[in-house]
């Protein structure tokens, strides 16, 4: 009893709409903060305006799609994709991408009153409030945390047609998201009007009535939407009293999913579940006001009322225009339009095209009160019914036959022609290369006027007959790389300057065994074994890591005077001596949790259904009830569950079935339309079937009576051609049928029997009888013949007398009497001269019924009617030449005249000029003759052009509509005479021409080839180039230009074509210059010389100046101190390179100090002769530039303290005191430097290059190069890998073997003939040496040397250690590795002066 009473009370409360006692509307204090003081932006005060596109910092999900921008529209909505300025709300759903969030879609006019504010917010206070609201209204998302909020507020806005005193509304839209879920909150403070006063809205002066405001959401696809109850009805005035979250005037929705989800409060009794009060598909929403259970219905489009029980009268807004009658339907209406109008709302006036059917794709176009068909290409006629014959213009060239198609044509070409108009191809002409003109293996290439021979190496000339002398000295198959110097590229298996040495067995490939597995290294003709670091190491530079200071497996990293330890996991401290405790060793994580240490703490990663610091708290399994339908897979998600739906299904529990179009059932590009439980496919042209799976097949085209048929297929676009039998003709102009996309052939033609009587062949009243391909004439009485052309001949009786001729007539005759006789039978004679029969002044003499004409000179004939000489009267005048022919004449007009009698003047074109000149073409233009009459006389222009030597004369005809022409296929650099004539074409092919407009011009010559820099010094740059004998035949001169620094001046020089190189002198050192070359043709100004396009510019830097006044201020037994002048002001140097050279090796050091003015060379040997060189280095954007080296020659003091001398590049010596030398380190020798041993050896070499980044390229003898990355002092042997291709010039470093000669001090003595060619013998500690005269080198000065330029590699040294075995002890050998810089150097070519066995050597 009590239960029934409770439900009765609930029902009464629900149906009674009771909200008394509940505070209506949301107070402004409860709105999300807004206004300019909060940082809001205000939309312009504009009717139907808005904010414009506002980019979003966070993508906002809406109806399953993410949006990166939105529009705040004044009319109460936020829209995506496009701005919506429509003021009268259209009933949802609507399409055309109108994605809208509508708090109050109505005709707002903020010009009269109110403002519209908006802003994007991410401040913590706003995010915290949004998070709390969503968790309250959607309790199923307790972990939601807002990351972005957008607030739009319409504050005290009025309606269109209102005033500043009209009612105003205040409402707000709040968008909230965390990047995945998105929500909307609507706040309504006061709603006093619902409608604008525009005619389409129908509101009154108080803003009520008509089509009221609409609130809700629209996806923009025409299907998905949601309306707040009362939308577009008068109930919208009470929207601030309704709610779905227990707060009157507030609504909350989740809008990220495919459908809108309504918020709730979860603490009231559900009226919707018990009563289900909403009808006609309306959605019931619990108001859930505490203590006052109620509901509202969200109605489908077309229904309204508290319970959606009222059908909306769509005719109430009078949608039918122009007097149309509205008929109401369910969620629809229809308009019956008056005469002259059409359309869903009678909005369109009828067009004359409505009843006009244009065929073959023609488009109807209304003109005034009539309709005209605009036809597709290929059709004509009033309704585009006639196919245009595109073959009528004979487009096929060179004998091709034309086939007419619809809107097109096809040419069937005759071999060997091809192309759309058979325009491509030519009849085969014998190749000039058939006679094999090229000798000595040359390759023949066809040219425009003959042939060109491409000669092999060693031959030249037109036919490759001339042999090129070869100065290459490379041996064993080596190839010369330099033009004027010997630089050889050796084949595999050979090496040496001239490839004269063959790679033989080396010490390291003779099965040499090294202790402890170390690898073998070539060493001074013998070998050394590289050792491991676990053996006793003795070297002169101890490392901070030698004491193994790092414990517990730590790795020691040595620095210059310190070290650091890299500790393994679990240890720390300077020497890795401290152990870290393992926090996870006690197993703190329970229930299968995983422990992870993080600094001095640990963290447990718990398995599913467990939580807590140690995974000690269990949670229930939310998937145990099997909530996912339709095969969905349940997985746990943020403490709850989520369904992973199979393809096509959606919804929280996979309860929403997929669209029939989900799996794209339509084939071949068909478009699928969703029909609810079924689908429909709209197929592409040419396909059919329920799923567009079948290709349209028109089938076999039917036969046409009295016609033969051919067709090329049965699919869309196929063509069938019909040809009528003799005696029949086509009923239509087209004989082609086309297979149409509908699967049917177009209408067939008919072969209608030809009515041969249609031409009325029967004469004289005869009747025609039609036959098949023939006819027969039934003649009237008195006529006969095939066409009744013959009558009975009354003239057979010869009724005419006195020579009269009889003419037969139907049933009669007539006599044609000779002159002098008249009468029916010509029986009466008359005066023959009475009619003055004699012409051209002839005299008539009567002769008894006849007459005789006595003709004047120049005329003859019975009546003097014939001119004996048609040119007698000079009909052509002085403007042409008369030509008599068959009694008539024709005029051949002189230049400048035309017309039958040469009476019209033919004027030439004017203002002939050259527009553009290229290598193979010239563009010219001109102006037509002055005067309209002169332009109408001519038919076109003749452009004649020929080379100045008279060869290759050509003439092109140009239509009179054009005033320019492009001359093509011209020879480069050649002068051409060009003439343009006005032309009038005549039927006898004797065209009339005007006087010519002429000019002389010359084409551009070909640009230069092989432009390169050959030498650079501090004040000079040398360049060279090449001219091809044939391609540059027209080049007369070469212009070389150099642009000075800072573009201050340009110097140009012209040289003859026989010159192929040039040197610019007097240049500034260390500056950048730009060099360009062009070719010139023509001997002088009168010959119109032309210039080629410039070659690519070369940017070249001159070398810096070498150090000036290089002097050795002090020389001891083991060192030498050098000084030089400070560089001139304005010169910025980067570094210096110091080279120390003996007769055995060269050592280099790179000093990165451009301000250096002195340097001390140490570690020299007592009593030795040295060459010291200092090179200045300047940095540019193209790399480093090196000056010429400044040289200094010294002799160190012996150990006994005696004085030695030094030379400054000459023979002026100074005496200096030396000091004792320190203990000597193993020395490095640079094998391929300027002072290599005089006799090359075949011992294998160990060489390496360093590029400054720790990458080392190493080479062992003839083996390929290898690369490896090393530290400054490797402590273990480094494996070689990563093969790199080396440059052509390889540098070799040899480690000399320590022997007793290095430690014993046995002075050498000089014999009488120790030094040759004037060299001076110098005794030494170990052996004597020779001080050679300039131009000689070698141990005994036996080599005569000269310098030639060559590409080279500069080296900057760096000392590194390398562990090797010496007996049973592992030492560190210190060697130098080098930074590499490519440069232009000088190579020495040396020739032995011995007469017994001459040989060359290149340094």
From Swiss-Prot:
Keyword Glycoprotein among record annotations: yes
Database matches in Gene3D superfamilies: Immunoglobulins (2.60.40.10), Laminin (2.10.25.10)
Annotated GO CC locations: extracellular matrix; extracellular region
Domain EGF-like: start-end pairs: 268-309, 311-347, 349-385, 387-423, 429-465, 468-500, 541-577, 580-616, 619-655, 657-693, 753-789, 791-827, 829-865, 867-903, 1306-1342
Cysteines paired by S-S bonds: 272-284, 278-297, 299-308, 315-326, 320-335, 337-346, 353-364, 358-373, 375-384, 391-402, 396-411, 413-422, 433-444, 438-453, 455-464, 472-480, 474-488, 490-499, 545-556, 550-565, 567-576, 584-595, 589-604, 606-615, 623-634, 628-643, 645-654, 661-672, 666-681, 683-692, 698-739, 724-751, 757-768, 762-777, 779-788, 795-806, 800-815, 817-826, 833-844, 838-853, 855-864, 871-882, 876-891, 893-902, 1310-1321, 1315-1330, 1332-1341
Gene that encodes it: Sned1
Fibronectin type-III domain ranges (all copies): 908-1006, 1007-1105, 1106-1200
GO terms for biological process, alphabetical: cell-matrix adhesion
Protein name: Sushi, nidogen and EGF-like domain-containing protein 1
UniProt domain Sushi: residue ranges: 696-753
Signal sequence segment: 1-24
GO molecular function: calcium ion binding
Localization, UniProt: Secreted, Extracellular space, Extracellular matrix
């Amino acid at each position: 009893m009590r239960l029934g009473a409770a439900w009765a009370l609930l029902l009464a409360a629900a149906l009674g709409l009771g909200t008394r006692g509940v505070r209506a509307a949301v107070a402004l204090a409860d709105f999300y903060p807004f206004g300019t003081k909060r940082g809001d932006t205000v939309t312009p005060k504009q009717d139907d305006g808005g904010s414009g596109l506002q980019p979003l910092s966070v993508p906002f999900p809406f109806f399953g799609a993410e949006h990166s921008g939105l529009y705040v529209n004044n009319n109460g909505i936020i829209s995506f994709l496009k701005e919506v300025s429509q003021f009268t709300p259209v009933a949802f759903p609507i399409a055309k991408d109108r994605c809208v969030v509508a708090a109050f879609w109505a005709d707002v006019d903020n010009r009269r009153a109110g403002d519209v504010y908006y802003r994007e917010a991410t401040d913590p206070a706003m995010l915290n409030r949004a998070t709390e609201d969503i968790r309250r209204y959607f309790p199923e998302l307790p972990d939601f945390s807002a990351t972005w909020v957008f607030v739009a507020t319409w504050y005290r806005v009025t309606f269109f047609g209102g005033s500043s005193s009209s009612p105003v509304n205040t409402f707000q839209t709040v968008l909230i998201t965390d990047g995945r879920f998105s929500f909307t909150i609507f706040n309504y403070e006061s709603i006093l009007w619902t409608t604008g006063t525009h005619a389409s809205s129908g509101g009154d002066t108080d803003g009520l009535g008509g089509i009221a405001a609409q609130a809700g959401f629209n996806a923009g696809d025409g299907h998905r939407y949601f309306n707040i109850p009362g939308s577009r009805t008068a109930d919208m005035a009470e929207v601030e009293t309704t709610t779905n979250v227990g707060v009157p005037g507030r609504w909350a929705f989740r809008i990220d999913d495919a459908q809108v989800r309504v918020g709730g409060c979860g603490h009231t009794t559900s009226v919707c579940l018990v009563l289900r009060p909403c009808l006609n598909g309306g959605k019931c929403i619990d108001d859930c006001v505490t203590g006052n259970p109620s509901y509202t219905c969200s109605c489908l489009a077309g229904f309204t009322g508290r319970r959606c029980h009222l059908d909306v009268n769509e005719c109430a807004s009078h949608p039918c225009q122009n007097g149309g009658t509205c008929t109401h339907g369910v969620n629809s209406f229809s308009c019956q339009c008056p005469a002259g109008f059409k359309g869903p709302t009678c909005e369109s006036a009828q067009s004359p095209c409505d009843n006009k059917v244009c065929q073959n794709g023609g488009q109807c176009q209304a003109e005034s009160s009539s309709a005209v068909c605009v036809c597709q290409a290929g059709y004509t006629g009033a309704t585009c019914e006639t196919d245009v014959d595109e073959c009528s213009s004979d487009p096929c060239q060179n004998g091709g036959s034309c086939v007419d198609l619809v809107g097109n044509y096809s040419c069937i070409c005759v071999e060997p022609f091809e192309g759309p108009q058979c325009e491509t191809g030519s009849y085969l002409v014998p190749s000039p290369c058939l006679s094999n003109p090229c000798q000595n293996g040359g390759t023949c290439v066809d040219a425009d006027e003959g042939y060109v021979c491409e000669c092999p190496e060693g031959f030249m000339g037109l036919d490759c007959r001339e042999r090129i002398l070869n100065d290459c000295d490379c041996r064993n198959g080596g190839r010369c790389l330099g033009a004027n110097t010997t630089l050889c590229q050796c084949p595999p298996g050979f090496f040496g300057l001239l490839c004269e040495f063959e790679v033989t067995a080396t010490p390291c490939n003779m099965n040499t065994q090294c202790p402890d597995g170390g690898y073998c290294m070539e060493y001074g003709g013998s070998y050394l074994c590289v050792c491991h670091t676990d053996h006793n190491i003795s070297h002169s530079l101890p490392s901070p890591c030698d004491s193994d200071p790092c414990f517990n497996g730590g790795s020691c990293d040595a620095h210059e005077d310190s070290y650091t330890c890299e500790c393994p996991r679990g240890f720390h401290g300077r020497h890795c001596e401290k152990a870290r405790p393992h926090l996870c060793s006690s197993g703190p994580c329970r229930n299968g949790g995983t422990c992870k240490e993080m600094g001095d703490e640990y963290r447990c990663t718990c398995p599913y259904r467990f939580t807590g610091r140690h995974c000690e708290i269990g949670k229930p399994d939310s998937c145990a009830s099997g909530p996912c339908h339709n095969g969905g897979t349940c997985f746990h998600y943020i403490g709850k569950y989520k369904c992973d739906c199979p393809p096509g299904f959606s919804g929280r529990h996979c309860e929403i079935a997929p669209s029939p179009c989900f799996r794209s059932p339509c084939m071949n590009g068909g478009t699928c339309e969703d029909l609810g439980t079924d689908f429909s496919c709209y197929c592409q042209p040419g396909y059919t079937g329920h799923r567009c799976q079948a290709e349209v097949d028109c089938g076999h085209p039917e036969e046409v009576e009295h016609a033969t048929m051919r067709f090329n297929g049965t699919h869309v676009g196929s063509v069938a051609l019909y040809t009528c039998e003799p005696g029949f003709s086509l009923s239509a102009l087209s004989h082609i049928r086309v297979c149409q996309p509908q699967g049917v052939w177009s209408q067939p033609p008919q072969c209608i029997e030809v009515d041969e009587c249609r031409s009325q062949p029967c004469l004289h009243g005869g009747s025609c009888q039609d036959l098949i391909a023939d006819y027969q004439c039934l003649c009237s009485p008195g006529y006969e013949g095939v066409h009744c052309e013959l009558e009975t001949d009354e003239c057979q009786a010869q009724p005419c007398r006195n020579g009269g001729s009889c003419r037969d007539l139907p049933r009669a005759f007539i006599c044609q009497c000779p002159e002098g006789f008249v009468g029916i039978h010509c029986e009466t004679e008359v005066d023959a001269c009475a009619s003055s029969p004699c012409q051209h002044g002839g005299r008539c003499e009567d002769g008894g019924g006849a007459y005789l004409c006595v003709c004047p000179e120049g005329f003859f004939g019975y009546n003097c009617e014939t001119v004996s000489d048609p040119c007698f009267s000079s009909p052509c005048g002085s403007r042409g030449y008369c030509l008599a022919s068959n009694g008539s004449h024709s005029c051949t007009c002189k230049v400048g005249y035309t017309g039958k009698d040469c009476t019209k003047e033919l004027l030439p074109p004017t203002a002939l000029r050259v527009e553009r000149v290229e290598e193979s073409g010239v563009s010219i233009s001109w102006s037509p003759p002055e005067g309209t009459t002169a332009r109408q006389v001519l038919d076109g222009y003749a452009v004649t052009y020929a080379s100045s030597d008279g060869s290759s004369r050509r003439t092109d005809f140009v239509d009179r509509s054009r005033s320019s022409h492009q001359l093509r296929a011209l020879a480069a650099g050649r002068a051409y005479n060009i003439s343009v004539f006005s032309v009038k074409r005549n039927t006898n092919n004797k065209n009339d021409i005007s006087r010519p407009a002429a000019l002389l011009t010359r084409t551009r010559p070909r640009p230069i080839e092989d432009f390169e820099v050959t030498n650079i010094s501090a004040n000079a740059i040398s360049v060279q180039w090449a001219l091809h004998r044939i391609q540059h035949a027209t080049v007369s001169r070469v212009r070389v230009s150099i642009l000075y620094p800072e573009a201050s001046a340009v110097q140009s020089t012209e040289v003859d074509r026989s010159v192929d190189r040039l040197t610019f002198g007097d240049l500034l050192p260390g500056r950048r210059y730009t060099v360009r070359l062009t070719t010139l043709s023509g001997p002088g100004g009168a010959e119109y010389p032309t210039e080629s396009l410039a070659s690519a510019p070369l940017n070249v830097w001159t070398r810096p100046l070498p150090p000036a006044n290089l002097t050795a201020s002090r020389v001891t037994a083991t060192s030498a101190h050098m000084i030089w002048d400070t560089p001139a002001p304005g010169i910025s140097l980067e570094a210096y390179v110091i080279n120390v050279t003996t007769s055995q090796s060269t050592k280099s050091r790179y000093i990165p100090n451009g301000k250096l003015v002195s340097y001390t060379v140490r570690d020299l040997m007592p009593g030795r002769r040295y060459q010291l060189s200092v090179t200045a280095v300047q940095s540019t954007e193209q790399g480093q530039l090196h000056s010429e080296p400044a040289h200094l020659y010294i002799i160190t003091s012996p150990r006994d303290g005696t004085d030695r001398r030094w030379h400054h590049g000459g023979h002026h010596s100074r005496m200096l005191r030396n000091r004792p030398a320190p203990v000597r380190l193993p020395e490095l020798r640079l094998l391929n430097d300027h002072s290599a041993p005089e006799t090359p050896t075949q011992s294998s070499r160990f060489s390496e290059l360093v590029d400054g980044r720790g990458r080392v390229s190493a080479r062992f003898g003839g083996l390929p190069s290898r690369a490896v990355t090393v530290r400054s002092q490797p402590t273990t042997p480094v494996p070689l890998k990563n093969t790199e291709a080396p440059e052509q010039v390889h540098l070799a470093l040899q480690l000399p073997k320590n022997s007793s000669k290095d430690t014993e001090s046995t002075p050498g003595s000089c014999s009488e003939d120790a030094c040759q060619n004037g060299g001076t013998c110098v005794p030494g500690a170990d052996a004597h040496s020779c001080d050679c005269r300039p131009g000689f080198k070698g141990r005994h000065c036996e080599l005569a040397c000269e310098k030639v330029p060559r590409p080279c590699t500069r080296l900057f040294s760096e000392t590194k250690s390398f562990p090797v075995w010496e007996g049973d002890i592992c030492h560190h050998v210190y060697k130098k590795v080098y930074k590499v810089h490519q440069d232009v150097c000088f190579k020495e070519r040396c020739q032995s002066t011995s007469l017994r066995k001459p040989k060359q050597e290149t340094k």
